[in-house]
Amino acid sequence: MKAPFTSLAGFRAVFETLPQVDAEAVEAATARNETLTKPKGALGRLEDLAIWYAGWIGDGRPALERPQVAIFAGNHGIAARGVSAFPPEVTVQMVANYRAGGAAVNQLCHVAGASMTVTELELDRPTLDFTVSPAMTEDELVAALAAGWEAVDDESDLLVVGEMGIGNTTAAAAIAAALFGGTAAEWTGRGSGVAGSALEAKTRVVAEGLERHGDALSDPLEVLRCLGGREIAAMAGAIARARVGRTPVILDGFICTSAAAVLHALTPSALDHAIAGHVSAEGAHPAALARIGKEPLLDLGMRLGEGTGAIVAINILRSAVACLSGMATFAEAGVSGG
């Protein structure tokens, strides 16, 4: 679907009339769940997940058949500041690896039965160093938001967004600090594996960016423009498109959560259609999830990004949906006690 906005004002307008969850589907799923051949509440959180999914799909007996994983790749000017354990050219190399089927995300998509798309966002033109100037112009931000919006498959019934971009945990840390408050050190973690003096340098870069753009950081979209990256903006655009289309979303790690947090800062109901797939080993991720009110499904010590933790959670949600829709009721099974 072509993005319905050509400016930041147009993107903001998207959030003025967001569709609501289908209350009738929630009611139907809840009623069905209470008649299934199990003690009440015996499936724990799976029951809540299935009812949540039913409400956004709009079907009291839903199916999960067409999950989409949308990966966005972008390069960052701050990568030249040595904030990552890997050089900037790795972004392009990893995109080639995705297309060849050789990355972890490819294997996990296969296991989860998910389609996978990869969107490259001007990899030959990194964003600007946000310690010197805004990372993006308004036009560049709008283009990235639109690219994310248009990458969403309208036929999908679940969306996961992932990212590739050397330096993007630095941008994510800066976004989180700007949106949530606190110091650069509180939000800056090891990312690709930096430690010691390299981690100190990364933290300084985040602090410099916050100081440089302090006057603009009361506006969430200005936070994204000044401190973010094209792939982070594209993730925000994709999550927004899913919200408008009432497509459920599983959020991934710290970078994805920072992108989602921009939407949450615009209006908290922007993330009603989203759950957190996991909590990553990136130290600030638990705090970021708490700030947007999301409880993770998994804690596996993952810190790869690229959507991987959320993809692992797809089959948990699929299991929940299968139980709601496929189990027999007490009456159907001829089992007493229902």
From Swiss-Prot:
It is an enzyme of class 2 (transferase). The active site is at 306 (proton acceptor). Keywords: Cobalamin biosynthesis, Glycosyltransferase, Transferase. One of its GO terms (biological process) is cobalamin biosynthetic process. GO terms for molecular function: nicotinate-nucleotide-dimethylbenzimidazole phosphoribosyltransferase activity. It catalyses: 5,6-dimethylbenzimidazole + nicotinate beta-D-ribonucleotide = alpha-ribazole 5'-phosphate + nicotinate + H(+). Its EC number is 2.4.2.21. CDD domains: DMB-PRT_CobT. It comes from the Bacteria. Pathway: Nucleoside biosynthesis; alpha-ribazole biosynthesis; alpha-ribazole from 5,6-dimethylbenzimidazole: step 1/2. It holds the Pfam family DBI_PRT. The keyword Cytoplasm does not apply. Gene3D superfamilies: 1.10.1610.10, 3.40.50.10210. Catalyzes the synthesis of alpha-ribazole-5'-phosphate from nicotinate mononucleotide (NAMN) and 5,6-dimethylbenzimidazole (DMB). Belongs to the CobT family. This is Nicotinate-nucleotide--dimethylbenzimidazole phosphoribosyltransferase. It comes from Cereibacter sphaeroides (strain KD131 / KCTC 12085). The lineage of its organism: Bacteria, Pseudomonadati, Pseudomonadota, Alphaproteobacteria, Rhodobacterales.
